[in-house]
Amino acid sequence: MRNIILFAAGTLLLSGCVSTQNSDVVQDDPYYAPMYPEPNVEPAVANGSLFNTYLSNDLYADKKALRTGDIITVKLQESTQASKAAKTETDKQSDAKLDPVIGLGGLPVNIGGDSIQFGIGSDASFKGDSKSNQSNSLAGDISVNVMRVLPNGNLVIRGEKWLTLNSGEEFIRLEGLVRPEDVTADNTVQSNRIANARIQYSGKGQTQEAQSAGWLTRFFSSSLFPF
């Protein structure tokens, strides 16, 4: 009974080490806060004019998002497929034998009518076979902010979208680097043109929790389980 109690207590303690997905994801994360246009840093000139060259655009200039705070719409078209297979097979056999001990006169030595001899054998084998197939796809749109313009002109973009539904919340987060040449005239860019892209799509709430295993199941499936 004592061993059962100790095992149960140890299971509860170790289960706390098993992390849950999206437990630290919250809305209004400052990291994904909107970036607003930089303030005008031009020195004020007392000429009586209200014209601001920083916020102005040439009549024939390209209207692409190229400044901090501008908005770019990302066209999500992501698709991945992966497969993996592994097979392992080992076999080992060993035998050891001691013939009957021969005594004086060339006769086997007997103890209690039985001759002295020894024999042992062992046989061990292992077979393992595993296969894994995974495919994912993501399509949709998300508008993000230009957070920074690098010296070479590339744009650091970042943003998120939250959807509050009856059974929970869903969110998309995206960040990466974009070349100005890849931004179209209507300020859109394909997701496969984003360098160092970090795209996260998940959710919180009853629907997401229903797809997650319980803490005890996660413990027995984790590396903490010794068997």
From Swiss-Prot:
Query: In terms of one coarse class, where is the protein primarily found?
Result: membrane
Q: Where in the cell is it found?
A: Cell outer membrane; Bacterial flagellum basal body
Q: Where is the lipid attached (N-palmitoyl cysteine)?
A: C17
Gene Ontology CC annotations of this record: bacterial-type flagellum basal body, distal rod, L ring; cell outer membrane
The GO terms this record gives for MF are: cytoskeletal motor activity
The record's Gene Ontology biological-process terms are: bacterial-type flagellum-dependent cell motility
Q: Where is the lipid attached (S-diacylglycerol cysteine)?
A: C17
Please provide the record's keywords in A-Z order: Bacterial flagellum, Cell outer membrane, Lipoprotein, Membrane, Palmitate, Signal
Q: Give the signal sequence positions.
A: 1-16
Membrane topology is: Lipid-anchor
InterPro entries to which the protein is assigned, alphabetical:
Flag_Lring (IPR000527)
Q: Which domain of life does this protein belong to?
A: Bacteria
**Assembly information from the UniProt record:** The basal body constitutes a major portion of the flagellar organelle and consists of four rings (L,P,S, and M) mounted on a central rod.
Q: Hey, which family's this protein in?
A: Belongs to the FlgH family.
* Protein role: Assembles around the rod to form the L-ring and probably protects the motor/basal body from shearing forces during rotation.
Q: Which HAMAP family match?
A: FlgH
Q: What is this protein called?
A: Flagellar L-ring protein
Q: Organism classification, top ranks? A: Bacteria, Pseudomonadati, Pseudomonadota, Gammaproteobacteria, Alteromonadales
Q: Which gene encodes it?
A: flgH
